[in-house]
Amino acid sequence: MKVILQLIVLTILVGCKPSAEKSKEYSWALLPFEKADEVNPVLLPDTNSTFLCPVRNTIVQWEEKDVFNPAAVVRNDTVFLLFRAEDSIGKFAGTSRIGLAWSTDGLHFKKHPVPVLYPDNDSAKIYEWEGGCEDPRIVEDENGTYYMTYTAYDGDKARLLIATSKDLYHWTKHGHVFKNDTAEVNKWSKSGAIVCKYQNGKAIAVKIDGRYAMYWGDTDIFVAASDDLINWTVLKDDKGNTTIFGPRPKKFDSDLVEPGPPAMLTDKGIVLIYNSRNV
C-alpha cells in the first residue's frame, strides 16, 4: 500500500473561485465550489418528528435539536442524504441518530420519518450509547452494496464503526472497523473516507495494490487497508509512523484535520477533501 503515500493529492479549499493563473495548477482540485444560497438550508430540524427509542423505550423527538454532517449518494437517479440528527435529552443534551432524505434535483429534499441507523439494544450499544451514531460517509461496491462508516460515541471515546445496506433504509451493523486490533478499538477514532472511483454517477470503492484504502482520523489523518471493506488494518510506514499528514502551524488547518467525503481516485492521483480548524 505504499502507492497510497505516492498518489495522495490534497484538496485545500482556499477560496471558492481560484484566479485564472491558479486554475491550471489546481485543475485536479474540483474547483470552483459555489453555494446555492437561494435554497439553503436544504434540511432543517423538525420538532414534530418522533421515534420510539429502543434503548430509552420512550418516544423522542429525534431531530428536534439539529440536522447536519450529511453524506450523499445517487441511487436510481435520486440523490439520497444520510444525515446526523440530534434530540435534546439525556446527559449530553442530545443523542445522535442517522436519518435519510431524498431529492430528484439535489436541492429540495423529503425526509424519511424515522432514523435509519441509531443506538439499539445490540452488540454496538457499548460504543453508541448514549452519544449516538454520527457523521456518516458512504460508498458502494460493484455489486450494489452500500458501506457506511460512522462515528459511535459512548460519552468517553469516539470510535469508527461500519454498516452495510442494499437499499439505504435497512442497515446491518458490523461493529468497529478495527475490531481485530484490540489496541485500536480502545483508541479515539472517527471519520472514515474510503477511496472510490466515480462511475456513472456512483462512488464505487476501488482497490489499490489489491486492497481497499480508507483515510480516517480527526487530529491527524491516517490510512487503513481492507480486503472486504468491513475489517480494516491501520497502515504504517517503514519507521512505524501512521500519520499521513497533520495540522500546519499558522495555517487555516493549524489545529485539526479530518477527512470529508470519500476520497476520489482520479487520473491525477487521490483527491481528498478534508475539513479543518485553526486556533
Predicted regions, residues:
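Sec-dependent signal peptide recognition
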Residues: 1-10
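Hydrophobic h-region of N-terminal signal peptides that target proteins for export
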Residues: 9-17
